[in-house]
């Protein structure tokens, strides 16, 4: 291969999926000359698995990304076709927006956004080598011999890195959706000293809608009052499609069990570790033998296609078995399978090789993002891409890094989990991973994170000021509700008794009534004639603040206590071999992870409270 000097840039982003997009846009918007490389420009922003954005925990990530200045939420609001707020029957901490996307529209929106972005070039090429000088990134080389000098590189390869797809005994070197795998980069990364591992994920079959009997399924409409992902989306989104629910049955399970010896998962063909929270249908059947059925959601792939996605039927069984099991499912008895399910194995890095900035510890200027870091999911990838892009830009500008803490939200929690604890399987974000769920609601992400977005230059002063005014309006409304008293009346007490709560004997403020779990801000409007016209988000924030006041105060105290440990930093050059009294396991883990603070050190698996005490005493003595 003939090499040639193809030019230079500040930052090279390798991959144009959800991580690569956010990394490239963030870096370019911060003024850095950026090139984003994609194996195929027609796959920019592709959704090779479920055609949806958000979900439990994931919707929180999208809102937080929007509050920081990312793009996913805005693109989703332009491309999504059905919106549902999950967990409405539970507390506000776990309310999570999920929306079906028109996958091709989403790609179109994102590709055009990249192409129109100042300081950003998009190129179709496979990067096969990352070059270094004096331990730092110096250039990237493509499969055609083009060498681009650069000062930083961000790896956002998704499932393409040495990917292979598996359907029964048919194994192909391939990325998702039949696209080419990225074959050349893994040996280079190993030569740079990175610890690589092999993970696996999978996807279900797709079917033609014309061959489906929807009358045998349960309709799953969108919300009657849908809301979008982006805080900047002013007009309410529109539901333009519906989903359906059906189930597997004992005949489906019998076919799977009769052919389990042909499953690559159980025959040993698949070596990669799969996602715990998105198992294949054969894994579900083998693991939960007592369950007579499993849910399957039938989801549209977009408005311009008849293809449907069968969520819950991920598999790597042979194609003939897939057809048989598909035809046992109510409504799918005559379904025409347009694409068969497959598993895909790919290379990824041990995320404990990364700093919280997502820069690798072994190569200066080399960052990882998304599935390369061991996570799963579009949303998890997008937020990591953003963090990597921002930190690469800040480092090249000589500015302080952006390190999001667990107390800041779900993005900080995700990254801390990956770089501190590591993961032995594809990591998925869930609300249960956050210790501060009530503070980290999806509805207040703008309040929590817009200030950081302003500092890094990705949120405008105008938008920041609008957020401050929004929450000032919330405070004004809370004060008004505290001061507005309602006298006992026959009408009020009848309303209270109807809603299962005690009548008022000597009057009460509206705030006191809203604090009752049986009552709502909207419902009490009957007894609040002076109520001002307020936007829905302001009304909602006021109600949440009053209803959960005690819990919120308690969690804020926990954050305050947490900050003490996080603010006690450990020196970059600390030699843990010199710290006498540390247990061997703790010493090894601390040397590998190299935590930034006592807080991070305390969360490392294998480092006990006693080890932290030893470290604190040693640090005091060092002073």
Residue ranges and their predicted role:
Residues 40, 186-323, 420-517:
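An anion/pyrophosphate-binding glycine-rich loop and adjacent beta-alpha core
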Residues 381-402:
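Internal hydrophobic alpha-helix adjacent to the cofactor/substrate pocket in enzyme cavities
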Residues 7-8, 25-129, 144, 152, ...:
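Conserved N-terminal/central alpha/beta ligand/cofactor-binding core
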Residues 131-147:
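Conserved beta-strand-loop-beta-strand element in the redox core of flavoprotein oxidoreductases
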Residues 371-379, 435-437:
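Glycine-rich phosphate/pyrophosphate-binding beta-alpha loops
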Residues 433, 450-455, 459-611, 617-623:
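Extended, charge-enriched "interface" segments that sit outside catalytic cores
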Residues 309-375, 403-416, 535-589, 594:
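A glycine-rich dinucleotide-binding beta-alpha-beta segment and adjacent secondary-structure elements
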């Amino acid at each position: 291969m003939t090499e040639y000097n193809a030019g230079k840039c500040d930052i090279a982003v390798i991959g144009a999926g959800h991580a690569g997009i956010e990394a490239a846009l963030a870096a370019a918007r911060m003024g850095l000359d950026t090139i984003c490389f994609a194996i195929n420009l027609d796959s920019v922003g592709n959704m090779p698995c479920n055609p949806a954005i958000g979900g439990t925990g994931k919707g929180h990530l999208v809102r937080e990304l929007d509050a920081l200045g990312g793009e996913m939420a805005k693109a989703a609001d332009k491309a999504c076709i059905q919106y549902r707020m999950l967990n409405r029957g539970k507390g506000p901490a776990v309310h999570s927006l999920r929306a079906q996307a028109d996958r091709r529209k989403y790609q179109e929106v994102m590709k055009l956004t990249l192409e129109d972005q100042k300081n950003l070039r998009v190129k179709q090429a496979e990067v096969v080598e990352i070059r270094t000088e004096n331990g730092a990134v110096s250039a990237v080389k493509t499969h055609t011999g083009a060498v681009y000098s650069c000062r930083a590189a961000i790896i956002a390869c998704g499932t393409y890195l040495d990917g292979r797809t598996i359907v029964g005994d048919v194994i192909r070197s391939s990325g998702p959706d039949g696209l080419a795998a990225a074959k050349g980069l893994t040996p280079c990364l190993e030569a740079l000293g990175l610890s690589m591992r092999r993970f696996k994920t999978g996807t279900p079959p797709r079917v033609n809608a014309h061959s489906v009997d929807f009358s045998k399924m349960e309709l799953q409409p969108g919300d009657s009052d849908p809301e979008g992902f982006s805080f900047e989306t002013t007009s309410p989104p529109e539901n333009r499609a519906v989903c359906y629910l059906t189930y597997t049955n004992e005949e489906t399970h019998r076919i799977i069990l009769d052919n389990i010896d042909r499953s690559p998962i159980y025959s040993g063909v698949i070596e990669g570790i799969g996602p715990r929270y998105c198992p294949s249908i054969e894994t579900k059947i083998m693991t939960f033998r007592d369950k007579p059925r499993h849910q399957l959601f039938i989801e549209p792939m977009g408005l311009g296609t008849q293809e449907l996605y069968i969520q819950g039927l991920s598999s790597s069984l042979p194609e003939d078995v897939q057809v048989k099991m598909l035809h046992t499912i109510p409504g799918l008895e005559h379904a025409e399978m347009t694409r068969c399910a497959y598993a895909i194995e790919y290379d990824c890095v041990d995320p404990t090789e990364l700093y919280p900035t997502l820069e690798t510890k072994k190569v200066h200027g080399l960052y990882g993002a998304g599935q390369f870091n061991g996570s799963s999911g579009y949303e998890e990838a997008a937020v990591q891409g953003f963090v990597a892009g921002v930190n690469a830009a800040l480092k090249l500008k000589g500015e302080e890094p952006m390190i999001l803490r667990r107390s800041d939200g779900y993005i900080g929690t995700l990254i801390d989990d990956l770089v501190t604890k590591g993961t032995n399987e594809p990591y998925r974000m869930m609300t249960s991973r956050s210790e501060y769920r009530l503070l980290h609601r999806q509805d207040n992400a703008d309040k929590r994170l817009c200030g950081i977005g302003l500092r890094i230059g990705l949120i405008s002063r105008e938008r920041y000021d609008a957020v401050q005014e929004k929450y000032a309006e919330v405070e004004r409304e809370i004060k008004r509700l505290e001061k507005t008293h309602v006298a006992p009346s026959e009408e009020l007490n009848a309303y209270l008794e109807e809603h299962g709560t005690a009548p008022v004997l000597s009057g009460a403020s509206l705030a006191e009534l809203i604090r009752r779990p049986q009552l709502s801000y909207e419902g009490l409007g009957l007894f609040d004639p002076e109520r001002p016209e307020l936007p829905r988000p302001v009304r909602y924030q006021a109600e949440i603040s009053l209803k959960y006041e005690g819990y919120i105060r308690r969690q804020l105290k926990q954050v305050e206590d947490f900050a003490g440990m996080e603010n006690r930093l450990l020196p970059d050059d600390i030699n843990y071999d010199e710290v006498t009294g540390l247990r061997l396991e703790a010493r090894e883990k601390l040397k590998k992870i190299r935590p930034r603070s006592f807080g991070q050190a305390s969360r490392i698996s294998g480092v006990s409270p006693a080890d932290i005490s030893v470290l604190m005493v040693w640090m005091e003595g060092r002073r």
